[in-house]
Amino acid sequence: MAAVSSVASLRGADYENGLRGGAGPSGGGQDPGEDDPMGRGTLDLDLELLTQGRRNRRVGGRTAPGRRSGGRGGSGGGAGGLEELEDEELEEEEPGELTGDQTIEDPELEAIKARVREMEEEAEKLKELQNEVEKQMNMSPPPGNAGPVIMSVEEKMEADARSIYVGNVDYGATAEELEAHFHGCGSVNRVTILCDKFTGHPKGFAYIEFSDKESVRTSLALDESLFRGRQIKVVPKRTNRPGISTTDRGFPRARYRARASSYSSRSRFYSGYTPRPRGRVYRGRARATSWYTPY
């Protein structure tokens, strides 16, 4: 609106100057409509002012140098001004003209970004692998590698009823060889070769556990059979109980020796010694007691 007001004021001033200069042949002036009957000079001025106003609004105060000439004297000045205005608008609308090289991406920067993305992906994969390893470590071990299972007394007795004791086993024998030797008796669940806990050497005997009790009775037929050049001893396994030896098969081992035997040995050794019996003999209703000598 300011540009239109300035154009109107300029046109009024030009008109007054033309009237003052003489409006006829006597005045010596020139009619503004003689050389330019269409008033194109004024139109060129108007277009130039309008173009300047639009430039200031679009570019924010920037004015392209060398494009102000609107062609005041020629008849094609107005059309030239419009063409320049359209060209300038097209140039302003093209992206990246004002920013220059800033819109062009740096290949080195792209390579760095790609490397960072690869490192992040590798870190994610390593984290997943670590989580899987932790899960596997927290899981219970497989049955084949499990440690000794604590069994109840009933379970132990039931397993012992399906097991046999094999004595006089060669020290170089393996569990596979023993399993092959008793394979015809039935399905073998487990073969245990006892070793010394200090030296790690075999003790010379083993235990074989079968799937059923019938296999135990069948395996007794291999008693005194030859295994690796030795005559082995095969007997049913017994549950370990207090006071029963695990090596002396079938012969219980008392915790304490009888005092009578020790006394008798001493009596034989010392002829004048008479042992004192532990029992008492009651006779009738008498309160008095008397010691007796069994020998």
Swiss-Prot record:
Cross-referenced SUPFAM superfamilies: RNA-binding domain, RBD
Residue ranges annotated for the RRM domain, each copy included: 162-239
Keyword RNA-binding on entry: yes
Annotated S-S bridges: none
Ranges where the record places region Necessary for homooligomerization: 145-295
Example of a GO biological process term: MAPK cascade
GO molecular function, one term: RNA polymerase binding
Ranges of compositional bias, category Gly residues: 19-31, 71-81
Signal sequence segment: none
Alphabetically ordered keywords of this record: Coiled coil, Cytoplasm, mRNA processing, Nucleus, RNA-binding
Alphabetical list of InterPro entries matching this protein: Nucleotide-bd_a/b_plait_sf (IPR012677), RBD_domain_sf (IPR035979), RRM_dom (IPR000504)
GO cellular component term, pick one: cytoplasm
Main location: nucleus
Coiled coil residues, start to end: 106-140
Region (Disordered): 1-102
Quaternary structure annotation from Swiss-Prot or TrEMBL: Monomer and homooligomer. Binds RNA as a monomer and oligomerizes when bound to poly(A).
Name recorded for this polypeptide: Polyadenylate-binding protein 2-B
Lineage: Eukaryota, Metazoa, Chordata, Craniata, Vertebrata
Gene of this entry: pabpn1-b
